[in-house]
């Protein structure tokens, strides 16, 4: 599990090092420490919206008797610690910090968010084929729709906080903890309800994203991949170009 969820960040760091050397790695990691945006309201929105959406879906699922049940306190505390070091920290630097930043160099924030959301959703697809994963008990279409819609919301956060990855980490953590409140397996009613709620959030998020490419993408702090000569990139990796 840890290997899977940390793979986006590991790959992003590897690509940054290969193409840009240590400066690329420093630039990518700099997205974590670039300071909070002046518009701090978006950090609060990032925490409250996912949690409120998940809790609302849990309430609806429980009302409809779909089997949703809250976790015991001990399990909730364990899940809290687990989520700190898994999805939120393991994925966001790679998906939003690296890939979304580069997508926005050639695409509008709106189109980049859609491409990012679809890619991120499909990345979760193999979870349906591994025994013991909670996705095996969820409707695939609803789950993928939910993840893609949430990904669009994360793209909005990333842009509105000027590429501060901590904002999307907080939102991702809030979302995962919201799921934990209701337990890992909540039934199809819960997943479909959550997919519907986040679809509405995604529509509003797309409306707030620009439809036109910007000269300086919000999260961009390093040049496009491949801008350095091949020999320089090989030298950065301590390889002999000959």
Regions found by a protein language model. Give the residues of each.
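Residue-level signature of the transmembrane alpha-helical core
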Residues: 6, 47, 80-85, 114-121, ...
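Membrane-helix boundary elements
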Residues: 106, 110-135
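Membrane-helix interface linkers and caps
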Residues: 1-45, 60-73, 157-163, 206-220
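Short, highly charged, low-complexity non-transmembrane loops/tails of multi-pass membrane proteins
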Residues: 214-237
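Membrane-interface helix/loop boundary segments of multi-pass membrane proteins
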Residues: 90-117, 159-164
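Functionally important transmembrane alpha-helices
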Residues: 138-196
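Juxtamembrane helix-entry segments on the extracytoplasmic side of multipass membrane proteins
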Residues: 68-81, 132-145
């Amino acid at each position: 599990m840890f290997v899977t969820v940390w793979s986006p960040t590991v790959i992003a760091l590897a690509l940054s090092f290969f193409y840009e050397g240590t400066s690329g790695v420093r630039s990518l990691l700099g997205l974590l420490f670039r300071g909070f945006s002046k518009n701090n309201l978006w950090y609060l929105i990032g925490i409250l919206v996912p949690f409120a959406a998940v809790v609302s879906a849990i309430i609806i699922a429980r009302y409809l008797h779909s089997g949703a049940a809250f976790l015991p306190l001990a399990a909730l505390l364990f899940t809290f610690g687990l989520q700190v070091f898994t999805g939120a920290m393991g994925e966001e630097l790679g998906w939003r910090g690296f890939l979304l930043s580069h997508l926005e160099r050639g695409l509008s924030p709106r189109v980049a968010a859609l491409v990012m959301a679809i890619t991120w959703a499909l990345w979760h697809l193999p979870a349906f084929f591994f025994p013991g994963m909670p996705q095996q008990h969820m409707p695939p279409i609803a789950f993928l729709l939910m993840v893609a819609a949430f990904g669009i919301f994360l793209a909005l956060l990333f842009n509105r906080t000027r590429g501060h990855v901590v904002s999307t980490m907080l939102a991702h953590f809030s979302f995962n903890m919201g799921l934990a409140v209701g337990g890992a397996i909540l039934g199809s009613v819960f997943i479909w309800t959550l997919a519907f709620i986040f679809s509405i959030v995604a529509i509003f998020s797309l409306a707030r994203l620009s439809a036109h490419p910007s000269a300086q993408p919000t999260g961009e702090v390093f040049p496009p991949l491949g801008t350095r000569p091949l020999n320089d990139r090989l030298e950065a990796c301590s390889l002999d170009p000959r």
